[in-house]
Structures are given as C-alpha cells and as structure tokens.
C-alpha cells in the first residue's frame, strides 16, 4: 500500500479548528475506508503518553521561553517516532491538531523566540519532513478572544492578550505565504455551516 498522507490543522486559539477536526476526519475516513486505509487523529502537544504529560506542563506552568520550545520539540520527536511515521508507513492518513507551524507561530511570532533557533530544532527533529497539507483556520484575534471567553477556564496560552495573538496570526500567515503549495487558508470568522463548506472543498481536492 502507498504511503499515507499527513494533514495538520492550525490556527490561533479560538479559531475553531478543533471544533471541525472530528467532522473533517469522519468525512475523510468515509473516503479512505473502502481502500482499507484508516485516519489517525492526534494532537500536539500530545499524541503519546510522554506528549500528553508534556502537554499538561506546557499549557499550565510558566517557564523559560527556550525551555518551552525544547519541550515542544521533544514531544514532537516522540510523536513522529511512535505515531505519525508508523501510521504513514502502513498507508494510513494522519490528521494532527497542530504541528510545527504552531511552534513557529506561538513561540516564534507570539513570544519572540528567534526564528533561526526554531529552524535548527526543526531540522534536528524532522529532517526535511513536512505535512502534505496544512489547513490554516484564520480569524481576527478579537473574534477568537470572544470565542475563548465563552468556554472553559483558559490555559496559559488561551489567556494571552490580543496583541500576542495578532503576532501569532501574522506568523501563521507569513508561513502560509512562504509555502502556498502546502497551506489552504479557511476563513473561520464565518458561521460553522460556511466553514464546513470550505472544508468540503478541501476534501474534494485531496
């Protein structure tokens, strides 16, 4: 069986990507199932036992910026080795709620960690590995903030300012501009039904 594909969902907190992730994966599984392929749904930080432990630390404990980035990439290496690469090798497709673009956007754009440091970690952990497709849920920070305020207690990142998320969004859009062959941008300021119509277009193009 041919190697599987790796799809990532990205966007600032409150963009709505997690809301649509399972719906997208269910539709994708309907298409792939007859060929004997499966859709593996995962997330970052997380995806493995170690990754989920790191997630609790990263989302809830203050720490040095470089420590934060190193922990992100440590969890990513484990995620690649134990979940993503084995699934792709057996022909399954993997859909992840966040991947390396999030680290460039949050730790780089949002927190100001120099890009060259993140690029060095990316090369070490991933080599040349990149997602086949990244779906970027784009929304103005003010709309995302209102959505975040309507749900559960926020974690460390969700509690950041609109200015932080404006920088994070700008970095996401910069990365999308640099890799247009990989990114599809979804206008997630739209109602849920309209966002799903956009995602149907993404599915149709796969």
Swiss-Prot record:
Biological process terms in GO annotation: dTDP biosynthetic process; dTTP biosynthetic process; dUDP biosynthetic process
Binding of ATP, residues: 11-18
Function description: Phosphorylation of dTMP to form dTDP in both de novo and salvage pathways of dTTP synthesis.
Substrates-to-products reaction catalysed: dTMP + ATP = dTDP + ADP
Keyword terms, alphabetized: ATP-binding, Kinase, Nucleotide biosynthesis, Nucleotide-binding, Transferase
Enzyme Commission number(s) of this protein: 2.7.4.9
Pfam families in UniProt: Thymidylate_kin
Family: Belongs to the thymidylate kinase family.
Record's protein name: Thymidylate kinase
GO cellular component, one term: cytosol
Organism expressing this protein natively: Burkholderia thailandensis (strain ATCC 700388 / DSM 13276 / CCUG 48851 / CIP 106301 / E264)
């Amino acid at each position: 069986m041919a190697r599987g594909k790796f799809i990532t969902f990205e966007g600032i907190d409150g963009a709505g990507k997690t809301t649509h992730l399972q719906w997208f994966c269910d539709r994708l599984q309907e298409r792939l199932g007859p060929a004997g392929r499966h859709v593996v749904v995962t997330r970052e930080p997380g995806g493995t036992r170690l990754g989920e432990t790191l997630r609790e630390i990263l989302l809830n404990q203050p720490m040095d910026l470089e420590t934060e980035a190193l922990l992100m990439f440590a969890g990513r290496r484990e995620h690649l080795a134990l979940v993503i690469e084995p699934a792709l090798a057996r022909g399954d497709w993997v859909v992840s709620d966040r991947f390396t673009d999030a680290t460039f956007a949050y730790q780089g754009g949002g927190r100001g960690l120099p890009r060259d440091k993140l690029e060095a970690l990316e090369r070490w952990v991933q080599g040349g590995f990149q997602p086949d497709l990244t779906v970027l849920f784009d929304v103005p920070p003010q709309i995302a903030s209102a959505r975040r305020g309507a749900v559960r207690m926020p974690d460390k990142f969700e509690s950041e300012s609109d200015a932080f998320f404006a920088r994070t969004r700008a970095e996401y859009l910069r990365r999308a501009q640099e890799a247009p062959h990989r990114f599809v941008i979804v206008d997630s300021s739209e109602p849920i039904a309209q966002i799903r119509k956009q995602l149907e277009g993404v599915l149709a193009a796969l």
